Amino acid sequence: MSEDLFVSINFPNGKSVKQPIGLYINGEWHKSAETWETVDPSIEEVIAKVYLAGEKEIDYAVKSAKEAFKTWKKVPGSEKGELLMKLAELTEKHADTLAAIEAMDSGKPLVSNARGDVDGTIALLRYCAGWADKIYGQVIPTGPEKLAYAKRTPIGVCGQIVPWNYPLNMAGWKIAPALAAGNCIIIKSAETTPLSLLYFATLVEEAGFPKGVVNIISGLGTVAGSYMAKHPGIDKIAFTGSTKVGVIVQQLAASNLKAVTLECGGKSPFLVFEDADLDQAVKWAALGIMYNSGQICTSNSRIYVQDSVYDKFIELFKKHVIQDYIVGMPFDDNTVVGPVVNKTQYNRIKNYIEQGKKEGAKLVLGDEPLPLKQGYFISPTIFADCSENMTIVKEEIFGPVVAISKFKTEDEAIEKANNTTYGLAAMCFTKDLERAHRVSDELEAGMVFINSTENSDIQAPFGGIKMSGIGNELGSNGIEMYTQIKAVHINFNNKL
């Protein structure tokens, strides 16, 4: 193992790590002709340079995965489950290191955010390990002269593209079900946040996965991501990211009609009815837009409050955000809101804030100067009295910025909630059980949260409709997305 494929990284908490920077292909670490600087968004300094995969490296990864698939697909589900369980144990053993890498590379607060992401990855690995020997088909009754059955088989070589907002967690959502179902994978991190997934590759190796089954690469979306999406040797592509890029991925994937799973953008509405528990609505609403600095696809970035409790909600919401959502450095134990991921996102979010003010939204909180002299920090920002034609209401901002509006009737709330091209998630706060079911039926979203938000479960499907995506991750549905149906017909006595 070449030492120049690893670098030493020192964390602000005094600890350090031997960080891989190469391409993990066919069970070995490789260099390439191109490198990329990954930057700590809290201090705007380079952490490390990682090697980038180009077409040549991806071709090699596909070749390796195809060869490995010949034997991996035949490995009993129980053995696949054991390997995934071993990987979960190793991830748990290295959880503090992985969380520190995420905090430095993405700006996530270590205590309030990054460690929880790693714990979620561990839980999902164990969940999918349990599924590996329980992927059943069905026997179909056809009469005494024939037997027909359908079996779920692995798809083959799966390309997976991970976003920068949850580098390891979203990787786990793709890696675990794909392997449990018997596929081989080539997974690409976001170029902005490659480090935790590269470190995870060392755990894959230690767990004992056969060469070629798991290939982990860094690469530019415009180069490696595009090439993976259109590669004729890749049988499925799974992508999490913006809707704009998701559309491109689907177009490229059509070149060989590969299976596609897309988890894209959102502009989730959060409805607060007058009978709601306002204290709870305030706390959940804040969590749903300020956590992870608002960089969550399901963020409830639109809040609609019934007119009779509108002013009270805004008063409580502002007070709660000021008290509980402290902006600070990722390794500070008190920090809840860290920096956004890079300068591009920082400028983009700032432009949206200016647009909100320009279009007449009332700035209730935010846009104040922060004591931090460097880093891509944005203070929690609350706009009120927003109208449906405002840019901050229509477009995904992907930052700690929320637009609040009022409604009079249930029908008006539903109409406003559905007035978007997105359909990932929606939230409804009410004590009226009948209303909860009635409204959830009418909301155009792949997921509806009643009296909560951002508390999806690994056992339940996660996915959107409309321009928010295709297919699901998590739950049994997430496993099935990595399988295909094969129907087998057995003739007993039917002779010609």
Curated annotation (Swiss-Prot):
One matching Pfam family: Aldedh
Entry keywords, A to Z: Cytoplasm, NAD, Nucleus, Oxidoreductase
Record-listed NAD(+) binding positions: G241, S242, T243, K244, V245, G246
Annotated compartments: Cytoplasm; Nucleus
PROSITE patterns reported in the protein's UniProt record: ALDEHYDE_DEHYDR_GLU
GO-annotated biological processes: aldehyde metabolic process; beta-alanine biosynthetic process; polyamine catabolic process
Site feature (Transition state stabilizer) residues: N165
GO cellular component terms given for this protein: cytosol; nucleus
PANTHER family: 2-AMINOMUCONIC SEMIALDEHYDE DEHYDROGENASE
Annotated protein name in UniProt: Putative aldehyde dehydrogenase-like protein C922.07c
